[in-house]
């Protein structure tokens, strides 16, 4: 009996066997990503794909400063409003910045024909040559070119007029018919602007042009229009009851434009030979110009980012990330981050059987932890880690390269009468934006799911690699660990890690230890059976003695009568 109890104690005592475990890296990262199946999954490493910051400034693009119109509008700048005189010398720019409430536009009130289309044309222009299309002194010898000024276009307290137009008036009591032409020899498109004056009454018409009925004719290969002044009293705007309507056309190289009139012509003085440049544009912004360089400019500020997406502003100029409405686009590159032994939630542990990551393993994503008589330690599996890093890096770079189409996205111009078209355009743009946002988010969700599954598979493969080497020389004890049936020193452990484990070398020792352990189990079972029998017999005797004592007590006090019949 003593021998059996000794065997039992030996079986119950813990064995100090050598072990090796397969595990994965964990750290103190708080990065979270979303997948198709889960939200806010904490991971060890991730990359952000969404730029959400800007510097709040207007910066140079490719070393070229923008054209800041200040208090002037596009109309004020291109017509030459006297209050915009500082802009006359500007010849090149990376983009044009206009404030939302620019004060100086058309100083003399009137209608600017096809203004939105002109803005659209200028948005693709990066420089121009301003030149005299009809020199002031020599082109109009029979007309007055100095008295055409107005208080509405005053400059430094004096009446003035646009710097790029001439208001031709009567000279010496007459306004002879005029005919003037220009041939475009610039080898570029030339922007030509002019106007037609509409007086408020017939007296002004006669005073300025010496005739009641007048006309203005403008003709080129692609433009042909005849204007008749509309004389009528109108509400005062900028203290003017008259109006000037403004017109423009683009003259192709080699084309000719002809002006004919017998009154009311606001003649071209300066024209512009346009140079178009990819990436230019017009933005409306209150931001100030700063001494900074950027690759991408938005109305909010400049963006310096190589990320494929941004949520700063849909209007961009330069090499810009694609705008999406997302608030988070983060792609996982590492593993699920579970630093301690805890559940991974609905989907269990990583690789299906390992409950927690190792913060002690810092030199790789997957690896080993061993324990033997010589000590314990962590070691990364460099080959599987490097293969995973290469694969994921290539995938992330591929995603960024495919989605990182840098481009300019400027707003489209519509006038007040085209409100329905503008609303329709917004709906179309919103639809495209929703599609882009959905595609970006779905791409990230799918790739995150694939990456985490990829890591799970790598851990599982590493486990199976060890299992296939050890075979029955060790037993699986759960949580990714194996317990050796033989002594495994550091050299032995290293052979398991590098795939050179010598199974036959340790198989005999393992077999003997397995048989000993199996024998201990059988002896333990015999002891447990003996103890069970003794326990049953002892319990029965105690029960019988108790019943006898109770019966004797009851018979002695008369509570129980006992009769024996023969």
UniProtKB/Swiss-Prot annotation:
<feature type="disulfide bond" description="Interchain (between HA1 and HA2 chains)">
    <location>
        <begin position="21"/>
        <end position="481"/>
    </location>
</feature>
<keyword id="KW-1168">Fusion of virus membrane with host membrane</keyword>
<dbReference type="GO" id="GO:0039654">
    <property type="term" value="P:fusion of virus membrane with host endosome membrane"/>
</dbReference>
<dbReference type="GO" id="GO:0019031">
    <property type="term" value="C:viral envelope"/>
</dbReference>
<keyword id="KW-1160">Virus entry into host cell</keyword>
<keyword id="KW-0945">Host-virus interaction</keyword>
<feature type="glycosylation site" description="N-linked (GlcNAc...) asparagine; by host">
    <location>
        <position position="40"/>
    </location>
</feature>
<dbReference type="GO" id="GO:0046761">
    <property type="term" value="P:viral budding from plasma membrane"/>
</dbReference>
<feature type="glycosylation site" description="N-linked (GlcNAc...) asparagine; by host">
    <location>
        <position position="286"/>
    </location>
</feature>
<dbReference type="GO" id="GO:0020002">
    <property type="term" value="C:host cell plasma membrane"/>
</dbReference>
<feature type="disulfide bond">
    <location>
        <begin position="107"/>
        <end position="153"/>
    </location>
</feature>
<keyword id="KW-0449">Lipoprotein</keyword>
<feature type="disulfide bond">
    <location>
        <begin position="488"/>
        <end position="492"/>
    </location>
</feature>
<dbReference type="GO" id="GO:0046789">
    <property type="term" value="F:host cell surface receptor binding"/>
</dbReference>
<feature type="glycosylation site" description="N-linked (GlcNAc...) asparagine; by host">
    <location>
        <position position="144"/>
    </location>
</feature>
<comment type="function">
    <text>Binds to sialic acid-containing receptors on the cell surface, bringing about the attachment of the virus particle to the cell. This attachment induces virion internalization either through clathrin-dependent endocytosis or through clathrin- and caveolin-independent pathway. Plays a major role in the determination of host range restriction and virulence. Class I viral fusion protein. Responsible for penetration of the virus into the cell cytoplasm by mediating the fusion of the membrane of the endocytosed virus particle with the endosomal membrane.</text>
</comment>
<dbReference type="InterPro" id="IPR001364">
    <property type="entry name" value="Hemagglutn_influenz_A/B"/>
</dbReference>
<feature type="glycosylation site" description="N-linked (GlcNAc...) asparagine; by host">
    <location>
        <position position="177"/>
    </location>
</feature>
<keyword id="KW-1164">Virus endocytosis by host</keyword>
<feature type="glycosylation site" description="N-linked (GlcNAc...) asparagine; by host">
    <location>
        <position position="28"/>
    </location>
</feature>
<dbReference type="GO" id="GO:0075512">
    <property type="term" value="P:clathrin-dependent endocytosis of virus by host cell"/>
</dbReference>
<feature type="glycosylation site" description="N-linked (GlcNAc...) asparagine; by host">
    <location>
        <position position="104"/>
    </location>
</feature>
<dbReference type="GO" id="GO:0016020">
    <property type="term" value="C:membrane"/>
</dbReference>
<dbReference type="GO" id="GO:0019062">
    <property type="term" value="P:virion attachment to host cell"/>
</dbReference>
<feature type="site" description="Cleavage; by host">
    <location>
        <begin position="344"/>
        <end position="345"/>
    </location>
</feature>
<feature type="lipid moiety-binding region" description="S-palmitoyl cysteine; by host">
    <location>
        <position position="555"/>
    </location>
</feature>
<feature type="transmembrane region" description="Helical">
    <location>
        <begin position="530"/>
        <end position="550"/>
    </location>
</feature>
<keyword id="KW-0564">Palmitate</keyword>
<keyword id="KW-1165">Clathrin-mediated endocytosis of virus by host</keyword>
<feature type="disulfide bond">
    <location>
        <begin position="296"/>
        <end position="320"/>
    </location>
</feature>
<keyword id="KW-0472">Membrane</keyword>
<keyword id="KW-1161">Viral attachment to host cell</keyword>
<keyword id="KW-0261">Viral envelope protein</keyword>
<keyword id="KW-0946">Virion</keyword>
<keyword id="KW-1015">Disulfide bond</keyword>
<feature type="glycosylation site" description="N-linked (GlcNAc...) asparagine; by host">
    <location>
        <position position="27"/>
    </location>
</feature>
<protein>
    <recommendedName>
        <fullName>Hemagglutinin</fullName>
    </recommendedName>
</protein>
<feature type="topological domain" description="Cytoplasmic">
    <location>
        <begin position="551"/>
        <end position="566"/>
    </location>
</feature>
<keyword id="KW-1170">Fusion of virus membrane with host endosomal membrane</keyword>
<dbReference type="GO" id="GO:0055036">
    <property type="term" value="C:virion membrane"/>
</dbReference>
<feature type="glycosylation site" description="N-linked (GlcNAc...) asparagine; by host">
    <location>
        <position position="304"/>
    </location>
</feature>
<feature type="disulfide bond">
    <location>
        <begin position="59"/>
        <end position="292"/>
    </location>
</feature>
